[in-house]
Curated annotation (Swiss-Prot):
Its EC number is 1.3.8.-. The lineage of its organism: Eukaryota, Metazoa, Ecdysozoa, Arthropoda, Hexapoda. Associates with mitochondrial complex I assembly intermediates during its biogenesis. As part of the MCIA complex, primarily participates in the assembly of the mitochondrial complex I and therefore plays a role in oxidative phosphorylation. GO terms for cellular component: cytoplasm; mitochondrial matrix; mitochondrion. Disruption phenotype: Late larval lethal at third instar; larvae die before pupation. Larvae have delayed development and an almost 4-fold prolonged lifespan, develop subcuticular melanotic masses, have small eye and wing imaginal discs, and have malformed fat bodies. It comes from Drosophila melanogaster (Fruit fly). Residues 28-43 have a biased composition (Polar residues). CDD domains: ACAD. It is found in: Mitochondrion. Its cofactor is FAD. This is Complex I assembly factor Egm, mitochondrial. It comes from the Eukaryota. The gene is Egm.
Amino acid sequence: MRPNLFSGASRLLTYSRNGKLLTRGRSTKATSSSLDSQHQDAATTEGGRAESVEESPEQQRKLPTREPLAKNFFIGVVDKELLAYPEVIPRDEMAQLENSLLPLKNYFVEPRETEETSPETLRQLGLYGLNVSTDYEGKGYGWSASLMASEPDSTDINVTLGLQTHRVVVDLLKEVGTPLQQQRYLQDLATGKLIGTEAIYEISPPEEDYFNTTAELFPEYGKWQLNGEKSFVICTPGERQLFLVLAQTQQPNVPGVLGRGTTIFLVDSQQEGVRLGEKHATFGCRKAEIRRVHFEGVKLGEDQVVGLPHDGNRYSEQLVRSSRLRGSLVGLSLAKKLLNELAQYTVNTTQCGVQLQDLELTRIHMSRAMCSVYAMESMLYLTAGLLDEFRAQDVTLESAITKYFTLRQVYAIASQNLGVVGPKSLLSGETTELGLRDAAQLCTQGESLDTLGMFIALTGLQHAGQAMNTGVRKSRNPLFNPGHIFGKFLDNNSIDNPKTKMQLSEHVHPSLEAAAQCIELSVARLQMAVELMFTKHGNAVVERQSEMQRLAEVGTLIYAMWASVARASRSYCIGLPLADHELLTATAICSEGRDRVRTLCTEIYGGHFVNNDNNLVRLSKQVAKSKGYFAVHPLTFNF
């Protein structure tokens, strides 16, 4: 909720990411340049720094870690083997899962006597324990299975908001919680006796600090005291809840900014000093219980700290990854609902003797919505499959990209539906009106899209900077590196016609050869744009926010293209129903994505004097100086 665009994005990059990295036997570079050896050196260095972490039996059964897929797009490297869409749920387990979901689908699809779904009903349906281990009376589902099992309840956005934040708390406890914390909380979380929820955001955060909510440690008692309030907390009044609270803390004997940190606490709603505040009258999701929560002198033990004290940013990666993936599922379900409602409306509506479905504009709108939903779903389950298939796989960027793409597209679909339906959509209670409100709520609650875009670009640039360091230094010092500059002059690679050597078409169905070529060209253009930005701006690249937003969109489009092609190729090869139309969908996504990537990268190459950024920045100074619109009336005389 902080207005500063860097508030969430840059903060998450301040902690070190330690994890085992297995350098692949052979990755494929998009363009031929001098970055190959640099990339290998960076990978070796990062692998050398990896710490040995004790792994669970579940992790040990997975395949070795691969290099990050989306991060490598920024340096022109692709992992062609990941074009094989993951199949992490065996056939027999998939059949059992589909059968177990039938009661859930029937409950949420069929009309109910009462619109309200009580927590007791959700307990009986077993929806609280989907991602809890079977050791604690849960279902024991992995990422892909738990997301698939969450689809029925995600059709009711007011119900699923509480369930998804509950599952985020479970995910964090499974990954970074101590054995004592897992034994204490997971069984109650699985059965619904205890309902987890995040308490992170504040309406008015401080200008300099992380949070107004603070926690102070009293070493002589071994206790923490928590004070403050959180907003936009999804509550279940009358039920026992477990709040996941991020609070600002100060390291002992380290004064000032150096000792400032964040700590993650687990706070039981029945503890003294915890009080539910008023319900927020939000723009969308109006039936959900979204409230303020007040913490007034709450005493917490050291066993209620998740991870290490003062080091909450270190565990933010696991927290936001889970939150983004499960939030993307909510957006995906809403987008599907909007598309289905629009299709029904166009089929059943006739105007001036013509069915709406026969109008070309309506067809184009429905097809674009279909492509967006297909890409959302492909990205979500590709990311989940990577987590399920590979050990400690880095999907930080993939999860952020999935949420970024999903929320942008679901809002676009919701707003465009208004134009198709017409003035009727303005009536209160219409499905189009409710859909627009819910889409706007998802886009605004939590991370803003601008902050998420900055995070995507910063993460990609951070990864690319390690690999491109040597080459960029030479390019920025041409007098001391004439051979390097001469090689650049002889290179006939261009942003309009980049050369690629990836041969992705060999790893997908032959019908997708053109789509694979679109991905190759887009990855090559992204790598060239990143290298140019480093060469032009150096360390000041983080200040070029408009260019970074373009980079974020390019990386997002490439991942959407990649996931769609991988999914469509699998569908056609195994003969799924309507797989030929999936090929058409993936081809349309890649064709449009290629053109958009070329436009964005050309704008980056042109610079701020060519792409109009300079004019807009200059204009903004006068807008700020005048505190708004500054032009006089167009009919004014000057005499």
